[in-house]
């Protein structure tokens, strides 16, 4: 019998080709989970999956454009069909696009809503029945759903109106869902990192990337710091639930 905390568990990680997503997949695989890697591009997924397998882990690639509701739901179904269960969902996909209402193209607003809100909702809705079943049948006696936001989503500024719309509600959604699933032993948590380099910065538009550029000499978070936070949440004993975690570099305000 394995002594790894997540032995026998199955995790689905979205945007698994990104630095944070790949780091999270590696962290969960090291804990013993089989990991379904979901992202739009299959090339990067192949590399992440190969790296996990070469280290003795179990990973499958599930290429999907999760902004398409049907494909988002199918990604969850494919994970369950191929790996037999679903114990952990990490909603890691997201994008930051900042511009004023006067100048922002509507297509950018649509992209923000499609990825930051609609995709998360469809993935969650499809996964919840499987998570409930996993909590009832797993030796861990618990399942986990982790949403990944950004501390900047709580800060209003010029040009951030629609991004704030897509992220400021994530905390309320996560907390309400946590209360709904308490009785089912499905833990629901929110991880909100500050600026991560390269990580989240790679998901910023060009203008946004320039605006948040790190001041000289100041450290920022690394992708593995966020992966460690997610790993910490899902490896707690079933008696313990971490509902929210904000992660900053020590020098960040």
Task: Mark where each language-model region is.
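Conserved glycine-rich cofactor-binding loop
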Residues: 17-19
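Substrate-binding pocket helix/loop in short-chain dehydrogenase/reductase
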Residues: 100-101, 105-113
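Conserved glycine-rich Rossmann-like NAD(P)H-binding loop of the short-chain dehydrogenase/reductase
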Residues: 33-47
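Residue(s) in the substrate-gating loop at a strand-loop-helix junction
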Residues: 150
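C-terminal helical subdomain
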Residues: 190-191, 209-253
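Active-site helix of classical SDR
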Residues: 124, 166
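The beta1-alpha1 cofactor-binding region of Rossmann-like NAD(H)/NADP(H)-dependent oxidoreductases
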Residues: 42-43, 63-75, 106
């Amino acid at each position: 019998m394995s002594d790894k905390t997540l032995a026998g568990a199955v995790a689905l990680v979205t945007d698994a080709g990104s630095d944070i997503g790949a780091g999270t997949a590696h962290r969960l695989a090291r804990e013993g989970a089989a990991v379904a890697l979901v992202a739009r591009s299959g090339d990067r997924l192949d590399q992440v999956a190969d790296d996990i397998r070469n280290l003795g882990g179990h990973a499958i690639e599930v290429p999907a454009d999760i902004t398409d509701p049907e494909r988002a739901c199918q990604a969850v179904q494919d994970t369950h069909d191929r790996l037999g269960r679903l114990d952990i969902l990490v909603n890691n996909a997201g994008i930051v696009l900042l511009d004023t209402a006067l100048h922002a193209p509507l297509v950018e607003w649509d992209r923000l809503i499609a990825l930051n809100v609609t995709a998360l909702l469809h993935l969650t809705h499809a996964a919840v029945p499987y998570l409930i079943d996993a909590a009832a049948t797993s030796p861990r006696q618990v399942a986990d759903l982790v949403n990944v936001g950004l501390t900047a989503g709580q800060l209003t500024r010029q040009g951030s109106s629609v991004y704030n719309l897509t992220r400021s509600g994530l905390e309320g959604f996560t907390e309400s869902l946590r209360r709904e699933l308490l009785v089912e032993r499905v833990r629901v948590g929110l991880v909100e990192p500050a600026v991560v380099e390269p990580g989240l910065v790679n998901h910023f538009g060009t203008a946004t990337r320039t605006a948040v550029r790190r001041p000289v000499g100041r450290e920022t978070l690394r992708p593995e710091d966020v992966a460690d936070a997610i790993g910490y949440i899902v490896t707690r004993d079933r008696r313990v639930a971490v509902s929210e975690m904000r992660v900053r570099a020590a020098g960040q305000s």
